[in-house]
Amino acid sequence: MSTLAPLLRELRASLHDDRTSGVTETGVPGVSFFWIDHALPRSPLLYDTGLVIVGQGRKIGYLGGRQFRYDAESCLVLGVPVPFECEVQVDDEPLLGIRVDLDPARIHALVAKFAAQLGFEGAETTRSGVEPVAMRGALLDATRRLLESLRDPMDSQAVGPAAVDEIVYRVLRSEHGRVLYDLTQHRTHYASVARALERMHRDYRKALTIDELAHESAMSASSFHRAFKAVTGESPLQYLKKTRLLKAKAALLFEGLGVEEAAYEVGYASASQFSREFKR
């Protein structure tokens, strides 16, 4: 049994929330708790940059031909926001976990302090922006301290942020620490793609072109396309389309917009084109 599961069940019980699934902020900035009481089939999902830690149940992620299993044995680190497909598997107990936002300033500070010791300088840069990291040893201990701090408001303020600092530090030192390290290396293709992704998520309503994004990334269109697909598992156009469709789905489900309103809200010039692509 996961050593995190009892703490997550305790947190779930403290919410007094009857919903079968949900997400809620915790007393630690940038840390949210999520739960799902039932299995869910493979479906599209948009993940922002962060760490996804599952202590009970399991998720299976699918991205560009790759498959990620994250559960009590491994967490998922996302150096860039990615739209991929996700499946939720539960046994007798609900899926429980936390999400930790990644603060760029925190990552930059750690890299500035420990760059030489990390051993990443001069090595080949990372390709994928999403990787699993084993939940064991010091990383598991730091996560346990974070969850324990949520029992008390003062602990959440004093101990929680320090535990988050250590979690990010431990991930940076892990087998896939480059996913975070390369975000701070501004001249790499990976960092350029990360900046392009920020632009796409900020301006997804606009008529963005690949040539424009490639120019801003100081790459040719073909080089940008290759680098983008290596990091996200999608071509730039596929990524932008999926992002718009997922944003539209959220607008339909949670904001009460109609189909035509949702289409124009996310940048489609034609509601009929949006309807065709949404049905696919």
What residue ranges belong to the model's regions?
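Basic, amphipathic alpha-helical hairpins
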Residues: 145-156, 171-180, 195-209, 228, ...
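Hydrophobic/aromatic-rich alpha-helical bundle segments in the mid-to-C-terminal region
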Residues: 22, 42-43, 89, 151-159, ...
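N-terminal regulatory/effector-sensing and dimerization cores
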Residues: 22-120
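A short, N-terminal "cap"/entry segment at the start of jelly-roll beta-barrel domains
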Residues: 1-34, 40-41, 123-130
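N-terminal positioning helix adjacent to the helix-turn-helix/winged-helix DNA-binding module
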Residues: 135-138, 142, 163, 185-196, ...
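Amphipathic alpha-helical segments enriched in hydrophobic/aromatic residues interleaved with Lys/Arg
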Residues: 2-11, 110-166, 170-171, 196-198
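Basic/polar phosphate-binding segments, predominantly the helix-turn-helix DNA-binding elements
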Residues: 166, 170-175, 183, 201-243, ...
